[in-house]
Amino acid sequence: MEERKRSNEESSCSETAVKKPKQSRELYNTLAAYGCRKGERADMQDTHILEPKFDLGEEKTFLSRCSFFAIFDGHAGPKASEYCQNHMSKMVKDRIPKTATDFASLTKGLKTTFTEAYKQVDDGFVATTKQHKPVWKDGTTATTMMILNNMIYVANIGDSKAVVARKKDDGTLSPVCLTVDHNPMAHEERMRIQKTGAVVKDGRINGVIEVSRSIGDVPFKSLGVICTPDLKKLTLTTNDL
């Protein structure tokens, strides 16, 4: 990841065609690390989640690997990203079907799982901000990744990227992007923003905020900023790093 800022349901997830899916359990190795840099800001506004072993219960014996990772690129303060760090993984886990008995039934509703989790986190943070005077202005992008066996599912809002490095036949690496950049210049985003009466100026909403989907950003909720994530999935191959 790079920090910056159902049946039919799964048809809205895009997947890259593959030739060599991983089959062996021993190939399911997950190494996780993180790095962060404050830059010129007065405080660190970005957070992350690393859960290489994301426990969904002992009864999920059909899972050889289950991991959860996330990055939150905060802006206008650290409170939104910190709230996401403390609540997002639980919100996702709580929405995984408890009655799932196989991989298909577990993954069938993942788009709803992520969409509802993002909405719950956003609602919770917005409610918290409104308890303070003045109301907090903090906001954050959110990119969450769940790895289940040889499948990667990525949900995101904002412009923090998730990328898989895939080795080509000549040995070089090619990036496979698993996120969608949500910015006011994109047609769908701009149309939604303009319907509220806001304008897109210099690539920003009313010349201020440069992402069109986020957690928090209370002053911009009425100007078309939403928290609905896009979801992509990818089948890992033996050529993926």
Cite the ranges covered by each PLM segment:
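PP2C/PPM-type serine/threonine phosphatase catalytic core
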Residues: 1-241
